[in-house]
């Protein structure tokens, strides 16, 4: 399967939203299992709505470049990047691959493309934030395989 990475276009929004919601469903299931039920419901009353809005916002933002992975005319994944030019840090801000095509190198290809783009934009460090829950384990393996190193961070929540 030949995959091309090209700039996101507005007509691809529905496909990007659809694949991202499918890709992130196991992640939110995992988060729900790890968090106190009341806290989870407070933070994510309807994660699909909030994630849809987040993807729409990222795809519309002029300062957030987005690329899509295309094969056989279908959008199979996307990556969004944010730059912080003061410390020269580029961030893999969003990444998702159609679940049926995960594990085939599409996510890695999107990340490598984004890293090359960041280098060309003058960034000297790349970062990505991801969850420590089981649902994010495949993402963590991919980032580590591509040379990212983890900085452990603990985040605690309590229902008030």
Predicted regions: what is each one?
Residues 102, 127-139, 157-160:
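Conserved beta-strand-loop-alpha-helix junction that forms the acyl-donor binding cleft
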Residues 108, 120, 124, 132-152:
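Conserved active-site alpha-helix within GNAT-family acetyltransferase domains
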Residues 2-4:
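Extreme N-terminal starter segment of soluble prokaryotic enzymes
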């Amino acid at each position: 399967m030949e995959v091309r990475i090209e700039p996101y276009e507005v007509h691809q929004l529905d496909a990007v939203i659809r694949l991202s919601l499918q890709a992130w469903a196991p992640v939110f299931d995992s988060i729900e299992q790890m968090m106190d039920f009341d806290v989870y419901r407070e933070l994510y009353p309807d994660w699909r709505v909030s994630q849809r809005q987040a993807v729409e916002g990222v795809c519309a933002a002029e300062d957030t470049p987005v690329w899509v992975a295309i094969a056989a005319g279908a959008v199979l994944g996307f990556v969004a990047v944010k730059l912080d030019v003061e410390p020269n840090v580029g961030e893999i801000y969003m990444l998702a691959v159609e679940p049926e095509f995960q594990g085939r190198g599409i996510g890695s290809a999107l990340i490598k493309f984004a890293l090359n783009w960041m280098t060309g934009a003058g960034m000297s460090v790349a970062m990505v934030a991801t969850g420590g829950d089981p649902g994010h384990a495949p993402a963590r393996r991919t980032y580590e395989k591509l040379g990212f190193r983890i900085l452990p961070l603990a985040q605690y929540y309590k229902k008030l």
